[in-house]
Amino acid sequence: MRGVLHKELLLYFTSVLFYVVATVFLLLAGYFFWTNLDFYVRFGGMNLVRGLWQYQFYDLRQLLLAMIPLLTMRLLAEERRLGTLELLWTYPLRDWEIVAGKYAACMVVVFALLGGTLVYPVVLSTLQPVQPGPLLAGYTGLVLLAGAFVACGLFISALTDSQIVAGTATYGVLLLFWILTWNEAALSEGALRLLVPFSLFDRFQVFATGGIDTRDVSFLLLFTVAFLAGTLFALDARRWRGVR
């Protein structure tokens, strides 16, 4: 697993794509923070969590939804295209080590991106006290959400040898889970009750407002595990078929 992790981190941090994604992510995150802070200042007296951090976390989750498919699209699709997946199988590596190494590498990149946004509460703390609890809850939600996104992207990347297809399909699948309950008026009460538990949008709401619900934590972890298990199944099926 360490070998896969080191290789993937090297590929990430020496690729132009990472620096493009990081630049766009941090510039947009900074812009959103500035506009949210301006809104908070203009409407003085608002609760800091609901007046600033809630909207900032909403904006960051949107950025993760857009950027993570770009980070995961090559993880296994490129190995399939180049035929190097079979080469990995010649090493003393089990499938779970390959999957875990690639997943961990992408999560390190996500941590780096989110780490860059920690400057905002640090700067704000020089002007007024900042409660750590709501921030911890919000970032916990972002990490869990990002973990679920990465697992989904890794699974889809295992199904194709095209990075473009993998990235586009990942974004489409995640967006579907995101907007499941947006058009509530068009859904029956039974359908709404069935779909709400699977809505990633709804699962993040409590985190953004400074709370942590164990049901949301459990769902996001199960979502992640399910897609990682699917990735293992896809690799195992490919190994047994013996095709490229």
Predicted feature residues:
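Hydrophobic/aromatic residues in alpha-helical transmembrane segments
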Residues: 68-72, 120, 151-152, 230-231
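Transmembrane helix boundary and interhelical loop/hinge segments in multi-pass membrane proteins
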Residues: 69-89, 103
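Hydrophobic alpha-helical transmembrane segments of multi-pass membrane transport/permease proteins
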Residues: 16-38, 59-67, 172-176
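Long, hydrophobic alpha-helical segments
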Residues: 55-78, 113
